């Protein structure tokens, strides 16, 4: 949601899709307040997914995740949403939903440009063909988890070697990004 709102504030026409829980009206209201199109959001009678991010005095974060409705995506729902988009459209994903591998495969087959923020980094990513990613947007901790390297230059080098077609933005906490 934060990425959708930030893009909408920058003047981009943004559609946000996903499954929200019974308490999700606040999320819908926030998105709509900033001009995010919520046509493809579906509300379910279960608890929604949510994330708590703790940031220390050095700008480093720790993420606590409850999957909720974010883990209830179906292939039918994904196909229904993707049917409204076309080649060249951007799809921004985080690793907070199920069926990520299916979504990446389908969007790529349609010619969409896939931007992936692999947060939270976990084993689900190994099921995804990450060669289909147009742009990785990750922090240095996720970069280390991907590559085993701590140095930002080494992280970028390894990621560029492994995914030569992808663009990479590596955020460095309080030190900006590269």
Where are these regions (language model features)?
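Substrate-binding N-lobe of the ribokinase-like
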Residues: 1-50
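Glycosyltransferases and closely related glycan-assembly transferases
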Residues: 86, 101-114
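Short acidic active-site motifs
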Residues: 77-81, 99-102, 123-126, 154-155
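Conserved phosphate/ATP/ADP-binding segment of small-molecule kinases
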Residues: 108-115, 119-178
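Short beta-strand scaffold segments in enzyme catalytic cores
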Residues: 5, 50-54, 62, 176-178
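Conserved phosphate-binding/catalytic loop of the ribokinase/pfkB sugar-kinase fold
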Residues: 16, 41-43, 53-90
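Short beta->alpha connector loops
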Residues: 20-22, 95-100, 118-122
């Amino acid at each position: 949601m934060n990425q959708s709102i930030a893009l909408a504030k920058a003047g981009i026409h943004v559609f946000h899709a996903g499954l929200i829980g019974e308490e999700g009206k606040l999320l819908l209201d926030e998105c709509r307040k900033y001009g995010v199109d919520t046509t493809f959001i579906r509300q379910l009678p279960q608890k929604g997914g949510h994330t708590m991010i703790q940031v220390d005095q050095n700008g480093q974060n720790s993420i606590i995740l409850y999957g909720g409705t974010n883990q209830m995506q179906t292939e039918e729902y994904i196909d229904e949403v993707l049917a409204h988009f076309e080649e060249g459209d951007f799809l921004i994903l985080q690793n907070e939903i199920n069926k990520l591998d299916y979504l990446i495969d389908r969007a790529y087959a349609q010619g969409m440009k896939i931007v992936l923020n692999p947060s939270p980094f976990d084993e689900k990513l190994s099921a995804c063909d990450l060669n289909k990613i147009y742009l990785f947007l990750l922090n240095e901790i996720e970069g280390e988890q991907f590559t085993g390297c701590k140095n930002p230059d080494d992280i970028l080098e390894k990621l560029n070697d492994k995914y030569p077609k992808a663009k990479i933005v590596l955020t460095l906490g309080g030190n900006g990004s590269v």
